[in-house]
Amino acid sequence: MAAKSDGAAASASPDPEGAAGGARGSAGGRGEAAAAAGPPGVVGAGGPGPRYELRDCCWVLCALLVFFSDGATDLWLAASYYLQNQHTYFSLTLLFVLLPSLVVQLLSFRWFVYDYSEPAGSPGPAVSTKDSVAGGAAISTKDSAGAFRTKEGSPEPGPQPAPSSASAYRRRCCRLCIWLLQTLVHLLQLGQVWRYLRALYLGLQSRWRGERLRRHFYWQMLFESADVSMLRLLETFLRSAPQLVLQLSLLVHRGGAPDLLPALSTSASLVSLAWTLASYQKVLRDSRDDKRPLSYKGAVAQVLWHLFSIAARGLAFALFASVYKLYFGIFIVAHWCVMTFWVIQGETDFCMSKWEEIIYNMVVGIIYIFCWFNVKEGRSRRRMTLYHCIVLLENAALTGFWYSSRNFSTDFYSLIMVCVVASSFALGIFFMCVYYCLLHPNGPMLGPQAPGCIFRKASEPCGPPADAITSPPRSLPRTTGAERDGASAGERAGTPTPPVFQVRPGLPPTPVARTLRTEGPVIRIDLPRKKYPAWDAHFIDRRLRKTILALEYSSPATPRLQYRSVGTSQELLEYETTV
């Protein structure tokens, strides 16, 4: 059997491949998962794995502080506008707070409904553990009512006894309380706060529990962190980004020394944008074991990079919008359309359906209005350089148009604003270079390096060997008589002849960023793995996630995830004749 992510039955069988190839991976859509067991008695094979540390807890607490400061300053500023009878500014400020929050809370509650809902006719996914013929532990789950499937001759506890009326009543009461609590939390617009606190709780539980439960809680913590990082990314660019431009425009329009409250709101929005981008990239790298994790030094460098880059971008927008409001709207729409089509042309692979992918590309187009956001696997140096050149030209043009409308012969304030935009953009580029040259997880990325290499010190060259066959033969020339006689003489003399069939060497394997487990149970997913910077499928597809968690919790040892290898299906294409 196979465990489908849409709720079908899931089971495990002994891994025919043994312990080979066991990296946890991800797929590009809904797929099938099966869990197979390794050697009997192996618990937590492959080492202790990652651990939740104190600095991880501090990072979550800082994220909560940024979240509350951003929302509180915006609401405080809206109330101030209302008390000053500035109803237009009050309406715009409150609109940029409430509308994105409602969208994000609806999405978060939709995820909760699916995560805590149960299939009709079943109290929950039934999970059993049994001994396979090969001596390993096999796992089986079913989402429909009924008994477990068993193998002949294997000890099986049989159908689970029906729960008593008291336990069923307590279970219903508990579920009702959870639903009421989650409904209240999302009505109060605190769904992300709940997810932050739950990620913190799961991380602490993974630190305090035993080895098997530690891995289980750590997986759940990664899932929760991924959810809240995606929600925060969506909310900040729908709320904090327009709020930043609005308040900066009002400050520029008024001139003089800025008031304290608008300055606090602008600073909080700017920090929220920079923090969310860095936190998103950190959680994304932490969730993939084929990538090195992002250190906190690198995350801080990313915060400073985005902080100064977005500050320069937002200030250029505010200067231009304070004079040319209509043209600013046209510019924003045109820039968003161009960037969205650029992202679509890149053929991203992020979501599970075509329409979700289009919506995701539209959101990325909004992000590209303000800053760089990598969405395509591979070397992004050229794309990033092109984007920053475009942003530099746009910032210079927007600031230049605003400066030309001022009386620059007597207005020293205008010259200061131009210098602030230029210096802020330069600082952003500086911290970006610091990150890529010193703090990138894969090592220096902007220095001289061999094409195709990931690490500076490689044990072998990254290119194919000199004797590798790089292209198939275009024709097979007819063997001449002299060649036939020479070959016969060589065979009679005992000269070794070259093999008729040779396997063309493939690409060299990518150095593994972390120590991967090669023992114990394995959950196989019959789909190719998504390429970075996309999320793994079990982070996006919630049905696949539920199935994996059920298999993982029922296993006596912590399983590892294994996705289908892309090269396996084209194995026959690697053979060529050398007649």
UniProtKB/Swiss-Prot annotation:
Compositional bias segments (type: Gly residues):
19-31
| UniProt-annotated stretches for the region Disordered | 1-40, 146-165, 466-510
Q: Where in or outside the cell?
A: Cell membrane
Q: Which InterPro entries match?
A: XK-rel, XK-related_scramblase
> Membrane spanning segments where?
59-79, 89-109, 260-280, 314-334, 355-375, 384-404, 415-435
What biological process terms from GO does the record include? apoptotic process involved in development; engulfment of apoptotic cell; phosphatidylserine exposure on apoptotic cell surface
- Keywords, alphabetical: Cell membrane, Membrane, Transmembrane, Transmembrane helix
Q: Does the keyword Membrane apply?
A: yes
Domain of life assignment: Eukaryota
Compositional bias (Low complexity): 1-18
Can you cite an annotated GO cellular component?
A: plasma membrane
| Pfam families, per database record | XK-related
What kind of membrane protein is this, topologically? Multi-pass membrane protein
What family does the database annotate? Belongs to the XK family.
Name of protein: XK-related protein 7
State the organism of origin.
Homo sapiens
The top of its lineage is:
Eukaryota, Metazoa, Chordata, Craniata, Vertebrata
